[in-house]
């Protein structure tokens, strides 16, 4: 009996870790690429479309966010200084927080801003990976941290999320009304978390964790020295009631149900982003920022100051056309 139970556990673990070879996906078409000048810390880690303005954050800059001037092919980042108040306690354990603090002295950026989003009136919301917290930067008034119930982090960790250094919250999306937020946990395990604000406190409405999954998957064939690596989420966007997850390890984005997080359809951007002249001598996908609109997708790269094959070192934003039939198209 014991040997049978042990065999079952081994089989389950094998299923969890066996590399998956993805089915072919429709390729998105690249229509423009824009280097970004003026980001002090480089490392573009989040994008948001607020009305007709594109905003960006860097995971190296704690005291400013960026409005992007997109009138020319080379975009100019215009800094908006922000006075960030002390970060509230989120429930992350001391070990994770201390490692993050130590890393900030080396790389800069104690807050580690990894995503930005906007509600319908233009308030901006920025997720701090280091602290599992969300900062609101209103159109008028001082920035403030959202009051999030500690049960959110407890539930996420109980589901296997937020357990590893530098693998915490990596993306954020908010509904137009400004009362529901979705957060992506990056990897090992990756997941989607949702919280709502009935009054002043953001809390779970039912389960916080919509998705928690492990597993590894082969990188696309265009990747030099492609290998099996952990599935990940590097950003999330909300468009017409659907979630779109940026999955940089596999160079894809996927449409998901906003309630269940179930996958509905995925598209690849590997063919154009991994064209020889656009490749980086880095072993992982660098896409970290996503905006979806009717016309297509904006995808931003955090290149860690590393050059592309053609020598370009600045942060990049790529524009991909929407797929045939639009983002709501069925397979």
Model features per residue range: what roles?
Residues 20-331:
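Sequence/structural signature of beta-propeller domains
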Residues 13-19:
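N-terminal signal peptide c-region/cleavage motif recognized by signal peptidases
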Residues 1-6:
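Bacterial N-terminal signal peptides that target proteins for export
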């Amino acid at each position: 009996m014991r040997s049978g139970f042990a065999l079952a556990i081994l089989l389950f673990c094998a299923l969890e870790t066996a590399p998956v070879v993805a089915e072919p996906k429709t390729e998105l078409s690249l229509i423009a690429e824009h280097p970004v000048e003026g980001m002090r810390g480089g490392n573009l880690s989040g994008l948001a479309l607020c009305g007709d303005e594109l905003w960006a954050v860097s995971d190296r800059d704690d005291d400013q966010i960026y409005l992007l001037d997109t009138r020319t092919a080379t975009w100019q980042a215009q800094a908006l200084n922000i006075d960030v108040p002390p970060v509230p306690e989120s429930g992350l354990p001391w070990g994770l927080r201390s490692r993050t603090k130590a890393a900030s002295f080396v790389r800069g950026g104690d807050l580690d801003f990894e995503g930005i989003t906007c509600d319908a009136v233009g308030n901006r919301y920025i997720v701090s990976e280091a602290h599992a917290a969300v900062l609101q930067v209103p159109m008028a008034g001082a920035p403030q941290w959202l009051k999030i119930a500690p049960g959110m982090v407890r539930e996420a960790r109980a589901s296997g999320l937020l357990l590893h250094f530098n693998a915490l919250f990596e993306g954020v999306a908010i509904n137009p009304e400004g009362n529901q937020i979705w957060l992506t946990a990056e990897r090992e395990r990756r997941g989607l978390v949702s919280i709502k604000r009935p009054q002043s406190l953001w809390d779970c409405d039912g389960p916080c964790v919509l998705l928690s999954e492990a597993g590894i998957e082969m990188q696309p064939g265009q990747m030099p020295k492609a290998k099996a690596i952990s599935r990940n989420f590097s950003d999330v966007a909300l468009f017409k009631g659907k979630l779109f997850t940026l999955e940089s390890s596999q160079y894809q984005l996927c449409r998901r149900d906003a309630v269940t997080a179930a996958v509905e359809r995925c598209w690849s951007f590997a063919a154009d982003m991994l064209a020889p002249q656009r490749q980086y001598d880095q072993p992982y996908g660098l896409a970290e920022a996503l905006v979806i609109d009717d016309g297509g997708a904006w995808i931003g790269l955090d290149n860690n100051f590393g050059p592309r094959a053609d020598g370009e070192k600045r942060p990049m934003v790529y524009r991909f056309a929407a797929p045939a039939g639009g983002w709501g198209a069925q397979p």
